[in-house]
């Protein structure tokens, strides 16, 4: 296995022991991108000159034994809706093509302070709206396990780049499953932290009450290491939580004997494919063999998650995206002859089909006469979904189930069928609506396409999720999976 598939933990050890220089790691990563990414299409922009310069500076610090930082010399890829100072940030949209920010997002400041090295920006569904990365204005990313399949979305580039060995970790954002679903489709580990665990300052907003940044990696411990680096309260984000405990690695390796695991009957019901059910049931038996107590429970309002989510998320999107007006920044129509035309034409030409669909839906749901029937009712359903989880967590430590109801579908198969596309979020949207942490880990394959297992935890209890996910991972040989790639 080449260094491109080394874990974050192993790379840190190799660098600390001076067996490899940060500049050698960065060179190997760019060589891998040059070789593989013309096919995978995961990157939208590379920051090669600055990355090489930063790596050379880290080489000098390494020589002086001044290797400060939790991620010293580790390459990273960042979803293109996370602001990067001086590097184009487009949200994969024509609307923001050529937009170069003049400030840094909080997560990027933290990662730079930990001496990670930015490799480039990763493809995504436009403004994070989609489940296949096919709504990107620039390119369609493919699944590294099967190039005929989608990588999932909206963080498809983030998942594909990690799976293909193009970066050891990436950041994505998760509004209704946009980290966990592509992680499942691409056979990697994806964590959606508790709402408020990670600062959203510098994340281009889609749905502000749902969005959360999180890491994608090739194993569980790496994921915990990265989340430690990016977590914490932020004065620039009033929704970030003042929670001091950001230690996620100390319980990794501890057994799960006696851990109470809830398996909702709704998560293996109608709409979930047989191959996914079988993989999850096998995973449940593995958890039992490790000493966990697994019992069936009910989350009765699960079926209302998708309609509730799409009304709330689209409503918030219609408000958040109103700032893209063709005047202050972003795409500016050259054909307009009046201010009203400028607004209309810039937005009509700058936004893609899916983004416009959701703006229309959200504007309708918030309009006079329909607000109570749609938006207000959806918020009430959101409370019911949260109450379901609260009740289960009175007696259980974690919830387990599939991440997605199927494996990755083919490119072009669902892009013109929004309802079918939205149905893929059946098992992920309730977690966002309740503000809970959720992690997806690989649990098998069907016809060469990965299957994801989702663990859902109590608020700010990511530590327990990592503990149980790590123990499960020890029974699933990821080395062989990536060696085949």
Curated annotation (Swiss-Prot):
UniProt keyword list: ATP-binding, Ligase, Nucleotide-binding, Protein biosynthesis
Signal peptide coordinates: none
Domain of life: Bacteria
GO terms assigned for molecular function: ATP binding; glutaminyl-tRNA synthase (glutamine-hydrolyzing) activity
GO cellular component: glutamyl-tRNA(Gln) amidotransferase complex
Known EC number: 6.3.5.7
Reaction equations catalysed: L-glutamyl-tRNA(Gln) + L-glutamine + ATP + H2O = L-glutaminyl-tRNA(Gln) + L-glutamate + ADP + phosphate + H(+)
GO biological process: translation
Enzyme class: ligase
Annotated active site: 79 (charge relay system), 154 (charge relay system), 178 (acyl-ester intermediate)
Subunit structure: Heterotrimer of A, B and C subunits.
Reported function: Allows the formation of correctly charged Gln-tRNA(Gln) through the transamidation of misacylated Glu-tRNA(Gln) in organisms which lack glutaminyl-tRNA synthetase. The reaction takes place in the presence of glutamine and ATP through an activated gamma-phospho-Glu-tRNA(Gln).
Family: Belongs to the amidase family. GatA subfamily.
Name of the molecule in the record: Glutamyl-tRNA(Gln) amidotransferase subunit A
Originating species: Staphylococcus aureus (strain NCTC 8325 / PS 47)
